[in-house]
Amino acid sequence: MLEIVQLFIQRKEFFMNLLYQHLQISFISIVLAILIGGLIGIFMSEYKKISKPFMSIINFVYTIPSISMLGFLIPLSGVGNTTAIIALVIYALLPMVKNTYTGMEQVDKKMIEAATGLGSTRFQVLWKIKFPLALPVIMAGIRSMAIMTIALAGIASFIGAGGLGVAIYRGITTNNTAMTLVGSLLIALLALIVDGLFAIIEKRIQHHSKKSIKKQLF
């Protein structure tokens, strides 16, 4: 344990730089996955005929090992951060799409009927009723997806990308256990912090979504 602390203090700038790179790669991947996965999930809930084929494709892609996925992408986008981000977004789509679709489908049909009866358009029902009610479930998906993305970003170093995976990979190749452990612990710590932040946001969204629906209907 003392060796790990000493290494971190001695190479603090090195590890902080890798931490920044890891945050950058993870943040971009998470934002893209939220936008793309959220839109796909909403689209699937509105057009249910395509939901099964879409979900089957996403489930199939999710079964491909991460190293294999990186291997498939290298001829298309080369090595580096771009390929790592593309791979992370692909893997992040399943929890994002699934939770968005599930959240939209779980909305009480009576609420939708009431809003439609009051003259709301399809878009208004989607934006003002279904989406706010589905938001807590969507947030749960974002939370789990963010943790998974941060953890999975550790493999980015295998294709020449940055991040804390560089420390892990270097530690493995040089038989430096302390280096590997520092990189792993920093990823775990980062994941825990992000999980805590999303837990706070999730609680606040649950509270505000209920209030906003009441205002819309009454």
Task: Give the ranges of each region predicted by the language model.
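Cytoplasmic-entry segments and transmembrane alpha-helices of multi-pass inner-membrane transporters
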Residues: 40-73, 88, 98-102, 106, ...
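Transmembrane alpha-helix signature in integral membrane proteins
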Residues: 15-43
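Glycine-rich helix-loop "coupling/hinge" segments at transmembrane-helix boundaries
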Residues: 74-75, 152-181, 186, 213-214
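C-terminal transmembrane helix and the adjacent membrane-cytosol boundary/short C-terminal tail
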Residues: 48, 105, 181-218
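Alpha-helical membrane-protein architecture signal
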Residues: 12, 16, 50-53, 82, ...
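Loop-to-helix entry region at the N-terminal start of transmembrane alpha-helices
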Residues: 17, 21-25, 74-95, 179, ...
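Transmembrane alpha-helices
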Residues: 27, 90, 123-155, 178, ...
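Short cytoplasmic-facing helical segments at TM-TM junctions of multi-pass membrane proteins
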Residues: 100-138
